[in-house]
């Protein structure tokens, strides 16, 4: 039997139905890679952050997420190279979709008249997204902005509903605005920690702070 179209599962009509010991035999998600590009780039290397934001309350199938990820990655890799960006998928398909299979194809002599709205068996996975929720985030250099925006614009066509492309005011994937990050970096109050940063805490253990930020305390002494 062919896969039921994702438009049948577009809207959030029911409660979340995740995989559990009561909900078994769930098929694997189609999307397995959530970070791609230059994942090990430091915070200072990619200051610009661009988001693809949902503008509707809906469900995105794992097949659609995988198709959009491939589409955006292929365009940005072809134009600017795979080391020019870091793309992160921000939603995960945990909601299990169900189907009540009934024979209605050419092989059946008559249409099967089963119970309408029956419970059904696990059929696929989808991510439940809210209005204003981030679907994709990409960090890159300022000079690569147009390429990233175009890549996310192409990825939008893989999703139902409406999405917006937003240029973030934050520095990369951190939660600091650009001027605030530069100020803290000059003062030595932040330290690279992969795609994120560690902050100098004004509270807590002094020994840990001295061990994590020796330059800051050496300058104060």
UniProtKB/Swiss-Prot annotation:
PANTHER family found in the cross-reference section: 60S RIBOSOMAL PROTEIN L10 (PTHR11726)
SUPFAM superfamilies named in the record: Ribosomal protein L16p/L10e (SSF54686)
Listed GO CC annotations: cytoplasm; cytosol; cytosolic large ribosomal subunit
Compartments in which it is found: Cytoplasm
Biological-process GO terms, alphabetical: cytoplasmic translation; ribosomal large subunit assembly; translation; translational termination
Biological role stated in the UniProt entry: Component of the ribosome, a large ribonucleoprotein complex responsible for the synthesis of proteins in the cell. The small ribosomal subunit (SSU) binds messenger RNAs (mRNAs) and translates the encoded message by selecting cognate aminoacyl-transfer RNA (tRNA) molecules. The large subunit (LSU) contains the ribosomal catalytic site termed the peptidyl transferase center (PTC), which catalyzes the formation of peptide bonds, thereby polymerizing the amino acids delivered by tRNAs into a polypeptide chain.
Pfam family, one: Ribosomal_L16
Modified residues (Phosphoserine): 143, 205
Start-end of each Sequence repeat: 167-181, 200-216
Region: 2 X 15-17 AA approximate repeats, residue numbers: 167-216
Subunit record text: Component of the large ribosomal subunit (LSU). Mature yeast ribosomes consist of a small (40S) and a large (60S) subunit. The 40S small subunit contains 1 molecule of ribosomal RNA (18S rRNA) and 33 different proteins (encoded by 57 genes). The large 60S subunit contains 3 rRNA molecules (25S, 5.8S and 5S rRNA) and 46 different proteins (encoded by 81 genes).
Family: Belongs to the universal ribosomal protein uL16 family.
Protein name: Large ribosomal subunit protein uL16
Annotated crosslink Glycyl lysine isopeptide (Lys-Gly) (interchain with G-Cter in ubiquitin) location: 40, 101
Record-level Gene Ontology MF annotations: structural constituent of ribosome
UniProt keyword terms in alphabetical order: Cytoplasm, Isopeptide bond, Phosphoprotein, Repeat, Ribonucleoprotein, Ribosomal protein, Ubl conjugation
């Amino acid at each position: 039997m062919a896969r039921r179209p994702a438009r049948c599962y577009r809207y959030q009509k029911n409660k979340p139905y995740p995989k559990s010991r009561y909900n078994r035999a769930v098929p694997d998600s189609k999307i397995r890679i959530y970070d791609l590009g230059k994942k090990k780039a430091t915070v200072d290397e990619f200051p610009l952050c661009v988001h693809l934001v949902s503008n509707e309350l809906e469900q995105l199938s794992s097949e659609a997420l995988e198709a959009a990820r491939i589409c955006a990655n292929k365009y940005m890799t072809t134009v600017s190279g795979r080391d020019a960006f870091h793309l992160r998928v921000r939603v995960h398909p945990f909601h299990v979709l169900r189907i009540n299979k009934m024979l209605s194809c050419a092989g059946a002599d008559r249409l099967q008249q089963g119970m309408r709205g029956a419970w059904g068996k696990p059929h696929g996975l989808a991510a439940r997204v809210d209005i204003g929720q981030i679907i994709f985030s990409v960090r890159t250099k300022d000079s690569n902005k147009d390429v990233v925006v175009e890549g996310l614009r192409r990825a939008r066509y893989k999703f139902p509903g409406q999405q917006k492309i937003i240029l973030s005011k934050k520095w990369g994937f951190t939660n600091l605005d650009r001027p605030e990050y530069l100020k803290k970096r000059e003062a030595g109050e932040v330290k690279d920690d992969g795609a994120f940063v560690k902050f100098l805490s004004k509270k807590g253990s002094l020994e840990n702070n001295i061990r994590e930020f020796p330059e800051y305390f050496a300058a104060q002494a």
